Structures are given as C-alpha cells and as structure tokens.
Amino acid sequence: MTAPASTVIPYFRPAVERALSAAGGLELTAPAQISGVDGQRIGRRSGNALEFSEYREYRPGDDLRRIDWRVYARSEQLMIKQYSEEIDPRCDVILDHSASMAVTERKAAAAIALAVIFTTAAANSGFSLNLWHSADTFRRDPYPADPFRWDFPPFETPFSPSSVPASFAGPFFHRGIRILITDLMGPDDPSSVLSRLADGAKRAVVVMVLDPEELDPAPDSNVMLIDTETGEERELVLDEGTLRRYHERLEHHRAMWASAAATRGVLLLPLSASDYHTEIRPDELFHAGLLK
C-alpha cells in the first residue's frame, strides 16, 4: 500500500469519497470553554492562546467575572472580554500509520474515512486545522482539509503512536481539540501517548478502530498468525478455549486504556471498522458529542 507524494492512495479513493459525502454537512463540536454560551462559534481571529482579542455584548448566562467594568463605567454597556482561543478554535487530527492499521482493507479504509470526517467537520466549523501522519515520526500534512492532496505514507511503519512522542519536535495547537485515530494494538504503556496527547489540550480524544475480525474472530482449525509490525509468526488452533482467552485479553487491554484515559481526562471511543467502510454510520461520533 504505497502512494505517490501529495495524493491519497488510489486504492482508498472510494473510502475518501464516501467520507466526504457523509461529512459534507457536519461540524466538529467545540468544547464549552472555546465556544459561546449558546455553543456557537462567535467569530474568527488570529492570535496566541489566552491573548485578548475583542469584546462582545453581555448575554444572560455569561460569567459575570468576565465583564469589563471599566468599559461599563465609560459607556454604561455590559461588555464581555473574549480571547483568541474562543475566536479561533483549533484541532489536531493524528492518524496512526502503523502496519496493524491495515491488517484488513476494511480497517485501513475506515481509519482514512474517520480522518476525512474529522478534518472535514473541523474545516466546516472554521477550526484552524492540523493533520498529522504518525509514521516513523509525526508528519504535518500541508493540505489537511483536502484529502485528495494528502501526503499519505503507507500503513507499514513498525512504530506505534506511543513510540513517537519522544522524537516528535512539531507543536500541537495549544488549548485545542486533539483526536488520535489508532487501534492501540501494541504492548505500550498508555501513559506516554495519553499524557502527550492531553498536555495543553482543551479536549483529547482517542478513537480506537478495530476490525470485526479482531473484535470477534471466527473459530478455525489451524491458522498462522503474523505480527504485521514485527513479522513474528505463530501457529494456533482457534478453538473455543483459545478464543475465550483472546476475548479476555482484549477486554483487559481495552479496560487498561480506558482507565488510563479517564485518569487523564481523555475520551476513549472504541469503534468497529464495519461502520466506516462501505457505508458511513457515524452515530457513535454524535453520541460522544464530537460532531453536530
């Protein structure tokens, strides 16, 4: 699965087209701290986080501590201070390009579709936007809102997102939304990737994508398991006992990540690739409050 520079892998073009069609009218939901009192974006300006940007009229329900009483003394108008983080919401989307993300065509297509949905919804909402490809390092895409021009590395790196932060020199947006699309299928300690993702963010989200064959593998007499990232091979009989132990370990693994995410205020959202493959069904993204 390789791609020429600055183009999406042609094989996944149908997935991109389906995701663009599904996301055409969607918007990314801003956390309450970076939206107006009614949940709507107020405007758009440039500037650094926490930098004063402009005033707006007081509305019932606004925090009274943000009224500028000096302005009121001069004009007898109640005015609220706004800061650049409220005027210019920001979003970083990080796509895991480790080899396990393409263990099936369906899983790879779903991961790409999710990246398209989030970047399109963020652009529709007027967010400043970064798309990061997590391969041997984090690569910032020059065209985050145009999937057909993405500089797309193949899903074949042995690195997982938790292996990258130490070598990652580029900045995430400060006080923005960060969304990591990955499968978390590795032996790594959750603390490093979750701490890096959440540090300085208003909201951090991990979208855990697994293929139906990973969620519920079918029994089989003899199978050869190949680690897509190390090449290690192991022959197994997928009988009832083996599958029971697999499900127990998978549940323990997911619970470990969920606990670590909750401790750090990160939303962990498990998804099935089947909902983002031939048909886009983003219901869980709405239920989680990520899209509107």
Regions found by a protein language model. Name each.
Residues 1-44, 56-65, 71, 76, ...:
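Exposed, interaction-prone extracellular/peripheral surfaces
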Residues 48:
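Residues that recognize and position ribonucleotide moieties
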